[in-house]
Amino acid sequence: MATTLTREQMFAEIVKQDEAKLDVVADTRRMSAVVEAGVGGNVVDLNVDTPNGVAAFQLNSHARGQVATDLGIPKRYFDRMLTEAPGLLARNVDHWLHEQPERRLVRGFKPTVEGGSGVGRAWLSDRYKRMDNIEIARRIFPVFDDIPGLTFHQAQLTDTRFYMRAVLPGLEREIKVGDAVQAGIEIKNSEVGSGMLSISPFILRLICINGMTVPDHSVAARHVGKRIEDETHFTDETIEADDNAFWLVARDTVKSVLSEVRFEEIVAQLAETVHGEKIQAPIAATETLASRFSLTEDEREGVLRNLVEGGDLSQWGLLNAVTAQAKEVDDFDRQAELEGLGWQLASLPAREWAQLATA
């Protein structure tokens, strides 16, 4: 089961990460890579020559993947060189940084030891627009105080994304007799190029506290803005992260997502999944599900177990078997993906559902 943060832990971590941020934009010809031995294996250090001195970043797995993709180095080959031919990897990276020069934004955290390397979190375009978690806390969270009864549910900050869910206990409906759901909201963001900032409905099933996100009714914003001109470290004052128009829309979206009208629309669609074609062969159906939606074998077996134990072979039963399995995974990013899959199943056209049910 993935760990989550309390409301207080969430705020503390957002502030801690914001204070530790170090973002640099520079021409790639002013960068160089060094591969050296680390505690858990070889690591890639990226040195960036800036007017303020050399900024050193030890790239994490996510940033290494972005560098590999941007430089046209197949990820499997990149990882093999990292392990078996570190010198070759450094030469490869340096060659393409200088042979095909571009301006890139490196997002990182400051070194914890003087003279050491910081953490390289992301390798991004110089048009990347920061809409960071600290801005969400400052500009969106205060709206929650204006919504009576809104209650914090869970949050997490992974290496690539931030998630926050809240629910509205006063707004709930039954999908079928004795099976109620509650309205909620999810705010999701990535500071490192792994997705848009989105505000979506979140549905909580009260019988087993399964969660489900509803992206069809979400509002999202891409992290794309004007080119960053200065080749230096930069702060909130030197970029256009302060997009007041967007944040005003975001605040209104929070209220819209939590409206009774929006909730009733979602409930009506979920209620339709109770009826219709029933699953005829659970094993075959979950195998088809796993193939179509890229579930692991462990996940498929978990969904099958939940489906059989739940005793509901309807579309509603299957989507809840999936969201129940989401609670069993150790990685919160994967949990969120499976919770989103629940809504994908609820949204399947009748013909596609029938094909899955009769597999």
Show which residues each predicted segment covers.
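Intrinsic disorder/low-complexity polar-acidic segments
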Residues: 130-359
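Feature for intrinsically disordered/low-complexity regulatory segments and propeptides
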Residues: 1-139, 147
